[in-house]
C-alpha cells in the first residue's frame, strides 16, 4: 500500500516538469488505479444488489413457491398407495446414492402410509429406526377397564385380555392356507414360510411385503380395541430384524413391526413381543422356520452357535425396546416361543432361558419377561426361577383341547368340565409364578385346513396320518369335519351354544391367572381360530372384559346344560 501511495505522490509531480521516464511510469500507475477503482465500484454495487434481492428471495419468493406446492399437493391425484407423486420425487432426492434400492430407500417400499419417509440411516442397538416419527402420545386408554398407557398396568390384579397377531410377520399355513396350496401330481411343494420364500424366488419380496401390508392394518388395531381387548401379542421370526442370507425378504418386516407398535399405541393397546422363530428352528415345527429342521441347542456345534446367536438377537432387540418411547407400550417381552421340551434337553433349555433373562435385563428392558412352558404346564418353574433372582417373570402356558387324542375325543360337556375344573385347579395349585395363557382358541376339532401341517389330515375324522385312520371324535365313527369348517351362519343352535360356552368357560378360568391372549385375531377362513370372525358371529362376548350371564362354570350341572351330555357329535 505504501508503494502505491508513493507512486501516486510522484505522479502528482508530473505537472511540475518530471522527466519522460517518470511520465511513462505514471501512465502505467494511472491504468492500475483505474482498474482498482472499477473493481471497487463493482464490488460495492454487488453488495447493494444482494442486500436488496436476498430478502426478497427468502421472505417473498420461496414462501410463495412453497404455498403453491402445498396447493398442488392437495389437489394432485395420489397413486394407488396413497402417496403424492411430488412427495415421491422429493423423497427420492433425499436418499443418497449408496442407499438407493436398499431397505432404507422409501421409493422401494410398497406402502408409506403412517411411515416417516424422511431419510435416515440412524440405528439403535444395531437396528434401524427408519420410518418412525419422533412424536407419540401415551395418554390413550384402550377401554374404561384399564389405565391409559402412561399409567402402570396393574398386572396380577387385573387380568390381561389380549389377542395374538400370528400368521402375519411369522406366517403359518393354517392361518393363510392360500399361500401354501402349491403342489404337483403327488405332493405339496411348500411346507413352511421359508420354503415359500424359496419357491417364490424373485417374486418373494413383493408377495410377502404385500401380505405384511394387508393381513394386519391400522383398522386391525381399532377393531381389537372395539372388541374390549387391551393387549396384543405380536409374533415374529428373527429374519425380519435385519438383512441376512436365510431369505431374500429378510429385514422388510422390521419396519412393519415398528409401525404396528405405533398403531397399537394409538389405540391404547399394550404389546407383548414374542420371538416365534429362532435361528435353526427351536422346535422343528412349521412356524419355527423350516419344517422338520431343528438346529438349535440340539447338541451339535451348529445348534450351540444358533442358541448363542439367539441371545445376540435379544441383546439388540431388548436394547432397542428399552428406549423411553417404548416403555409404556412394549410391556412384555417373550424370550422364545415353544422350544421343544419333548426332544431337546430340558436342562439346557432352562439354562438358556436363564441366560436370555440376564441378557434382556442387562440390555435395560425393565418390563415383564415371559418364558414358554413348552407344553410342560405351569408347575415347578419356581424351582428354577425364584422371584427374588428373577423378578417380573411370566410363565407362558398354551392351552388347547384338540392336539391330544384323549381331550379331543371328549363329549362337549366333558370338555367344559376339563376347562372349568381340571385346568382351573391346575392353575390354582401349580402356578406358583405369575402365569399367562399365551394361546388358546375356540376350536373343538383339529379340522382347520393345514392345521396339522400342509397336506396333513385331522385327528377328528381319522385322516391324520400318525393315527392310522382312527377317528378321534367321541363316537369314533361317522366323524365329519364339514360342520366345523362351514360358515358360522350355518351352525346349528346347539353347536353355537356350546362354542359360546367353550369360549366363556376359558375366559372365566384364564381370568384367574395374570391373563390371556387368544390365538388368533384373524385367519383366511378358519372361524374358530379367528377372534374377529368368532366375535362377529356372536360366538364370543361382545366385550372381552364384560362377559354375559349366558354361561359360567357354575352352571355346568344345571338342567339347562345337561343337554351337552345327551347330544351326539355336531
From Swiss-Prot:
Keyword terms, alphabetized: Cell wall biogenesis/degradation, Glycoprotein, Glycosidase, Hydrolase, Secreted, Signal
Q: What is its main location?
A: secreted
Family, similarity comment: Belongs to the glycosyl hydrolase 5 (cellulase A) family.
User: Glycans attached where?
Assistant: 91, 116, 121, 184, 203, 248, 364, 525, 552
| GO BP term, example | glucan catabolic process
Instruction: Identify a single GO molecular function assigned to this protein.
Output: glucan exo-1,3-beta-glucosidase activity
What does the UniProt entry say about where the protein is found? Answer: Secreted
Instruction: Please name the source species.
Output: Schizosaccharomyces pombe (strain 972 / ATCC 24843)
Principal EC category: hydrolase
Name assigned to this protein: Glucan 1,3-beta-glucosidase 2
EC assignment: the record states 3.2.1.58
Catalytic reaction annotation: Successive hydrolysis of beta-D-glucose units from the non-reducing ends of (1->3)-beta-D-glucans, releasing alpha-glucose
Question: Where along the chain is the active site annotated?
Answer: 338 (proton donor), 439 (nucleophile)
List the GO terms this entry assigns under cellular component, sorted alphabetically: division septum; extracellular region; mating projection actin fusion focus; membrane; plasma membrane of cell tip
Keyword Signal (UniProt):
yes
From the broadest rank down, the organism's phylogenetic lineage runs: Eukaryota, Fungi, Dikarya, Ascomycota, Taphrinomycotina
